[in-house]
């Protein structure tokens, strides 16, 4: 941080918008990602005791991670939070937009991590959800309708509580055995 702010300069708030804007592109992306994760974690944590959340969950040998695993009335969901600094949309089952790198595949990565974590924990995820800031998505939400990642959702952060209450698809239903799932996940989960 000192490389672009200046040596010997006191930094009161490292998330000050002026400092963030002056940072190199890669650092700006990491800061935006961290802020998006924090905002989503705070939102889910405020939903009440009907929800259990695990943050920064390690998958496999630790090469993959899921930002948030949420168990609630609508089932077990894998969430990742992102802020690409521009509007994004769903195209051919993947997130695309000016801020999304060509080799970046958020839905495919999250779905892969959720399937792998599900096998490790002996549970099944109801959906994979990519959460973006409200101004980062033109539609309230978009859902992958077909293909390998069918059911995955790209959603505005403000609508996440509604999704967590109602679920993504009537066919999936909630977890009637949520205490069993919670116990299984809690006993086997590993954190980054």
Where are these predicted regions, by residue range?
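Active-site beta-strand-loop-beta-strand hairpin of nuclease catalytic cores
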Residues: 71-91
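Short, mixed charged/polar active-site loops
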Residues: 63-65, 76
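Surface-exposed interaction regions that form or flank ligand-binding interfaces
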Residues: 1-63, 90-91, 95-192
């Amino acid at each position: 941080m000192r490389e672009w702010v200046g040596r010997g300069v006191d930094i009161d708030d490292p998330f000050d918008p002026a400092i963030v804007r002056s940072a190199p592109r890669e650092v700006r992306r990491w800061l935006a990602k961290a802020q998006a994760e924090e905002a989503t974690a705070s939102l889910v944590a405020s939903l009440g005791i009907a929800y259990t959340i695990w943050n920064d969950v390690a998958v496999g040998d630790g090469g993959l991670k899921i930002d948030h695993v949420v168990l609630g009335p609508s089932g077990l969901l894998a969430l990742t939070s992102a802020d690409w600094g521009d509007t994004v949309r769903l195209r051919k089952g993947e997130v695309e937009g000016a801020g999304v790198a060509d080799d970046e595949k958020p839905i495919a990565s999250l779905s892969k991590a959720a399937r792998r974590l599900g096998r490790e924990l002996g549970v099944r995820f109801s959906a994979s959800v990519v959460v973006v800031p409200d101004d980062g998505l033109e539609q309230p939400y978009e859902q992958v309708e077909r293909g390998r990642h069918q059911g995955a959702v790209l959603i505005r952060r403000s609508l996440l509580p509604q999704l967590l209450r109602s679920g993504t698809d009537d066919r999936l239903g909630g977890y009637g055995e949520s205490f069993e799932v919670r116990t299984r996940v809690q006993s086997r989960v590993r954190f980054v």
